[in-house]
Amino acid sequence: MQLQAITHIPLSKDAYMVNENTIVIRLKVGKGDIKSSDVYYGDRVCMSEPILVKRVSMKKIASDELFDYFEGKIKSEYTRVCYYFHIKDIEGKETYYSEYGFSEKMTCCRTQYFQFPYLHRNDMICIPKWTENMVMYHIFPDSFAEKKNYISGRRKVIQIENGLTSESKNGGTLRGILENLDYIEELNVNCLYLNPIFKAASYHKYDTIDYMEIDPCFGTKQDLKDLVNECHKRGIRVILDGVFNHCGSGFLPFLDVLKNGEKSEYCNWFYKLNFPVVYDTIPNYEAFAYVKEMPKLNTGNQEVIDYFCKVGRYWIREADIDGWRLDVANEINHDFWRAFKKAVKEEKDDIFLIGEIWEDSTIWLMGDQFDSTMNYTFSYICREFFAKKIISVSQFDQKIHRMNLRYPEMVTRAQMNFLDTHDVSRFFSDCAGDDRKLRLAVLYMMCAVGIPSVFYGDECGITGITESEYRKTMQWGCEDSLIEFYQKCIKIRKNSKALCTGTYETLICEDKDEIYGFARKTKEETIVVIMNMGEKEQKITIPGAKHQWLDVFSDEKQDGNQIVCKGMSGIILKKI
């Protein structure tokens, strides 16, 4: 038995509350080493000694290249729980595992067990219910539309206060988005995420000058209100981009620092100022990515925290927005985010918060800061497997399972999955012109665990490697089968409880034939997805599923013993 591979961390993704009387317990063990694992639990403050314990059998739920993962659910009548594991390996050897370590015989001393001190209602991670069937459409406002089915691609510059200007590169506006809601609605998405729209100097608007005003290149507050109101009438939610890690060099507090130096009342609003502060090519103050136009805010300062809590509340109250995507979230103080979440939740209790974090986000996703983060890992895996085909089917499966187990289940379901964004090259550019690769990736994204997000124009086959290319103007007038494919996949996703909230189980993982199949299940529904990554047509048997299935694309019935899947294509099947 590989004792060194066995891991459990209490009060983490390995032990978390689902509701007031249910705890999910996970155990990581060496791959192929353990035959079974049970978790024994009891009342940690029971008046008798030894305490009565109950057994819950654990199930192996996933594997990666190094480990197997077991999971069990404790449905406890106790509010204070202690627990330990009884583990058997494939050779019949047994061990007990507790806070105290490993032993051949389990101690009766409850203080040496793993502890879940108290099942507090407020410690549950609660994700807004409306996000369960959410499919997001991500719009870069400058590049999308000026009016219905049109964007000029022409630059414009508008004079604003303090001798500053605001720039638009392609001419997109909020009114243009509003006039194209029919198109957006026909895609079947039910949420819009807009990159920054507040007053700023640059075309991308990540250098905010005024957090309480809409950028004049994009329109007015009334335009935003009209857009959100019309979206809500159509059942579409709206998420705005909040850039609170840094501001633009034209932000009034920073201008005051430039003017008044150490006497400025805003000195403590910024990081590492060297006086006299010089606005030059190489800034003598902390800035985002060393860019002088983006001085870093001191988000540990209470005045700064209070100001941005006010900003967060203001746009909920003013425009009835439904969420915030929070830029450079991992460079901002945790106390800032705790205060921000408390403030915006008081304003609207089902507001949805997404942090821009490119790596493991565990510390931000414990329930006190964000509901979700941008899942760049998902994009990396999909590029390797679908676009570039540089990892095998089994490697893909291992990476997906490891990704899905980074967080508690409800948090994983709320992760923002995407193939590309405004910060990376277009996914289709990695596909070498083969739209079958894109279609397979889209099909998988719509069936995977997590919230799917489509970057504007992906449904039209937009490509782009450099920033100016992947942020190019929307390709209006593009009517082809790729758009229809997106529409169908999104509709299937939204209408399936299993795809939105179900478990994820690998069914087929064949490197030689390049076949991957998995199931998404709830008590009421089972969906099986089969993907053929090879060029040859394959006849596939669904393991243990001899009943009838419905191909949700063709509406044709299929026999589970012989599913025909063409080369470089996928099938979504519903159990009937």
Where are these regions (language model features)?
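Aromatic/acidic polysaccharide-binding cleft in carbohydrate-active enzymes
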Residues: 142, 366-372, 413-420, 425-435, ...
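Short glycine/proline- and charge-enriched loop/turn segments
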Residues: 205-214, 288-292, 377-381, 467-475, ...
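Short, solvent-exposed loop/turn segments at secondary-structure junctions
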Residues: 142-145, 198-200, 244-245, 330-331, ...
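Substrate-binding/active-site clefts of carbohydrate-active enzymes
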Residues: 134, 140-190, 197-318, 340-346, ...
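Carbohydrate-interacting/catalytic domains
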Residues: 1-135, 140, 153-154, 162-163, ...
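Conserved residues at the C-terminal ends of beta-strands
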Residues: 195, 214, 327, 457
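Active-site-proximal helices and loops of the catalytic beta/alpha 8
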Residues: 228-236, 246, 251-261, 317, ...
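Hydrophobic faces of well-ordered beta-strands that scaffold small-molecule active sites
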Residues: 135-137, 192-194, 238-240, 324, ...
